[in-house]
Regions:
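Ferredoxin-type iron-sulfur electron-transfer modules and their immediate structural context
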Residues: 1-103
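Iron-sulfur-cluster electron-transfer modules
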Residues: 16, 35-45, 78-283
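Short cysteine clusters
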Residues: 48-54, 58, 106-112, 116, ...
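Iron-sulfur (Fe-S) cluster-binding segments and ferredoxin-like electron-carrier domains
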Residues: 57-83, 115-133, 367-381, 407-418
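Cofactor-cradling patches in redox/metallo enzymes
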Residues: 119, 200-290, 329-340, 350-438
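Extracytoplasmic substrate-binding proteins
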Residues: 134, 252-253, 283-285, 301-315
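C-terminal amphipathic alpha-helical segment
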Residues: 297, 305-344
Length: 438
């Protein structure tokens, strides 16, 4: 079934469609294209040769080899290029179809740009489609709820301020049984770094906060975590196209670090949040660079290892493979440092084929996993190529330093019955490092 013929039931897409008049659609499109974009879209539309080279890059296209509607250029033709051709004169039903494609058939992983002979940035164009849809109120229900949470609480999981602090205190108390004297310092001024995480950690994965605190304690790090709203470094608004709220989130995050007078921000193992903090948020706020330096966990662990601050008792013996998160590898070039860290920790590393910047996306990124259950089957069908890639390694452990990648890979592993499991770098370091004898 071609992507235009498939209808995914989503209450917010339908509600937004019902409220979108032709006049409002045209006005919103023209306001965005003239006020925010300039000539960039027109240049891409005119330089794209419709050659189909991008089809070799897209996991959706490779997973549906007999259906040309899944190629990136076809998706552009059905969305942003259609918007430009029609000068924004589209009806509500057409916009609903465009919104569905933009939120289901592109993870904005940017693998395709490596294959395009003229460098058309398809991910940017699809994010522009989402921007238009967001201003029309045609955004999937589940991801819009996370954006609403950002607006109300400055985190994506509706975590209250007291719940956040309680989670940190709880993990500190738990860790003291294993690491006497350990602290999770709150609002410590002048520390070397502020450690920031995404909201799913206090909500679902509190053990990762425990592990990070243990690693920093054993490494002798001078660190802190903020207690006030702005602690969550994630950003679903970047994916919905609500750039105004994206800017507010990033400003709040950096202002916390500035108030604490830390030297830099160390971010947990999340890809999209890292990109939002070091790239998207800065540009939307018209900052030349981050007001406080930002380091991803991959790079920070690499530093600790090279400085001899992490000591392990043994290496992980079972064979592992490395998944390359799009936003830290294609987007930031941390492939070598990731491999240095994994090879330090693991005795037997089997590379995926392809790997590094050519690795396939997990199909969770770009906010697609956050669109929720209605979109899950499409996500699974659209990444058969990743399942094949994982299966071909012959291993049972996947090292993936990204939250969304864990969610996407775990879904793929279960759906295709691969018999594998995922690990964060922090999982491995905590498991293998020297610990005090209590």
């Amino acid at each position: 079934m071609g992507i235009e013929k498939r209808l995914i039931e989503d209450a917010n897409l339908t509600r937004g469609m019902q409220l979108a008049t032709p006049e409002r659609i045209t006005k919103v499109i023209r306001d965005v294209l003239k006020g925010e974009v300039g000539v960039r879209v027109k240049v891409y539309e005119q330089t794209c040769m419709r050659c189909g080279a991008c089809a070799k890059a897209c996991h959706f296209s490779l997973s549906h080899p007999d259906d040309a509607s899944y190629t990136p250029v076809a998706k552009l033709d059905k969305t942003i290029f259609k918007i430009v051709r029609e000068s924004g004169k589209l009806n509500a039903e057409q916009m609903r179809g465009i919104a569905q494609i933009a939120h289901t058939e592109c993870n904005m992983c940017r693998r395709c740009i490596h294959y395009c002979p003229v460098g058309v940035d398809i991910a940017y164009l699809m994010s522009l489609v989402r921007r238009i849809c967001n201003k029309l109120g045609i955004t999937p229900t589940f991801i819009q709820d996370t954006a609403n949470s950002h607006s109300a609480t400055f985190n994506q999981m509706w975590v209250r301020e007291d719940e956040w602090i309680d989670s940190l205190v709880w993990q500190e108390e738990e860790a003291r049984e294993e690491f006497p004297g350990i602290r999770i310092p709150l609002d410590k001024e002048g520390a070397d770094f502020m450690y920031s995480v995404i909201a799913p950690e206090p909500k679902f994965r509190t053990q990762l906060i425990y592990q990070a605190a243990a690693i920093f304690h054993q490494a002798g790090s001078d660190w802190t975590m903020p207690s006030r709203p702005g602690w969550d470094n994630s950003d679903m608004c970047m994916f919905t196209g609500d750039y105004e709220m994206m800017g507010r989130i990033k400003r709040a995050h950096f202002e916390l670090a500035q108030k604490l007078r830390v030297k830099r921000i160390v971010m947990g193992e999340c890809g999209h949040a890292f990109r939002s903090v070091y790239d998207q948020g800065n540009r939307w706020l018209a900052w030349k660079d981050s007001p406080v330096p930002v380091v991803h966990a991959i790079e920070f662990y690499w530093e600790l290892i090279n400085e001899g601050k992490i000591k392990i008792t043994h290496q992980f013996e079972d064979p592992v493979t490395i998944h390359d998160p799009c936003n830290t590898i294609r987007g930031r070039g941390l492939a070598d440092k990731l491999r240095d860290v994994v090879h330090f920790l693991c005795a037997n590393v089997v590379e995926m084929t392809p790997n590094r910047e050519h690795n396939f996306c997990c199909s969770a990124g770009g906010g697609i996993i956050n669109c929720g259950p209605p979109f899950k089957s499409v996500r699974m069908e659209g990444n058969r190529v990743k399942a094949d890639q994982l299966r071909n390694t012959g291993v049972h452990t996947v090292v993936a330093p990204c939250h969304n990648c864990h969610g996407g890979l775990e879904d793929i592993i279960k759906h295709y019955k691969l018999g594998m499991h995922t690990k964060f770098i922090g999982d491995l370091i905590y498991e293998l490092m020297e610990k005090p004898e209590v």
